[in-house]
Amino acid sequence: MYRNWRDLISPKKLQVESESLTNTYGKFFAEPFERGFGTTLGNSLRRVLLSSLQGAAISSVKIKGVLHEFSSIPGVTEDVTNIILNLKGVSLKMHGNEARTVRIIHKGDGIVKAGDIVTDANVEILNPDHHIATCSKDANLEMEMVVKLGKGYVPSDRNRDEKAPVGTMPIDAIFSPIKKVNFTVSNARVGQMTDYDKLTLEVWTNGSVVPEDAVAFAAKILKEQLSIFINFDEEAEPAEEAETEEERERVNENLYRSVDELELSVRSANCLKNAGIKMIGELVSRSEAEMLKTQNFGRKSLNEIKDILADMGLTLGMKLDGFPDPEVMRRIRGERKDEE
């Protein structure tokens, strides 16, 4: 049963396009996947990235002299509704888990930007040039805003706090630190085969989390959600069958047999010869991906070899400690001479 996942081809590592990598953008590549896995994983990662990563946002605001969002403020060009819309665009990063209160106090004419928000050490403004309001010389703008952590989109009614002072207006909050995610799936080559998937993932963030970490967090969330479906211990996978000493001895001898004894097709035999593979032990120590990289070695030859090895109790990708063993080789040679 363990061959269900052991025999699948999978990427060795995630590649990053270093030339375009920034704190807000990253392009990632992973290949080869079995056909269909690129779309499955790409779509899953995209949905988790957009919906499930934690971030910080302004959840409510209290403006001095204002009781509701349909008011206007003397000396301020924007009405309260537009100011609230502008506050939604402020990108923040929090270094703690507790909600924090930040403030804006501005008198006289000028442009009020996100950089004018007075914060403490636990809150960082990531887009200080973001426009909030335009004030004239007789303006007196004082605001208190609550910043908290969350995930996804939270409507204003869920941000309402019954204990908040009169005049506090809840805001629709977009907590997600991810601005956009794209993924594409193209063909990947393994040996002579081109029917594998290559996943390309592009991630844009607001800067509160770097793209590499965002992808890692999303993958971790997926792993945790899927773990309940695994009904066995991953730490110590049992062998499919307990081998007797006699069976183990027979398998060992098979490893030292020549690949010519496998009676492969001419094409497969020539591929092994060109790859310098002489003994069955050398063959089974190669993975499927490594074999498919061999010149002229395709899926048909791979399946032929896998079937023959399976009849011998062997598989590709085996870890052979101490192979070849000189003592075993001498014993086998001696037995063959006696037979002659």
UniProtKB/Swiss-Prot annotation:
Name of encoding gene? rpoA
- Any one GO BP annotation for this protein: DNA-templated transcription
**InterPro entries, A to Z:** DNA-dir_RNA_pol_insert, DNA-dir_RNA_pol_RpoA/D/Rpb3, DNA-dir_RpoA, RBP11-like, RNAP_asu_C, RNApol_insert_sf
Specify the signal sequence span.
none
Describe its assembly: Homodimer. The RNAP catalytic core consists of 2 alpha, 1 beta, 1 beta' and 1 omega subunit. When a sigma factor is associated with the core the holoenzyme is formed, which can initiate transcription.
Q: Which reaction does it catalyse?
A: RNA(n) + a ribonucleoside 5'-triphosphate = RNA(n+1) + diphosphate
Q: Name one GO molecular function term.
A: protein dimerization activity
The Enzyme Commission number assigned here is: 2.7.7.6
Q: Region entry Alpha N-terminal domain (alpha-NTD): which residue ranges?
A: 1-233
Q: Which protein, by its recorded name, is this?
A: DNA-directed RNA polymerase subunit alpha
What job does the chain carry out?
Answer: DNA-dependent RNA polymerase catalyzes the transcription of DNA into RNA using the four ribonucleoside triphosphates as substrates.
Name the Gene3D superfamilies on file.
Answer: 5' to 3' exonuclease, C-terminal subdomain, DNA-directed RNA polymerase, insert domain, RNA polymerase, RBP11-like subunit
- Say which family it is in: Belongs to the RNA polymerase alpha chain family.
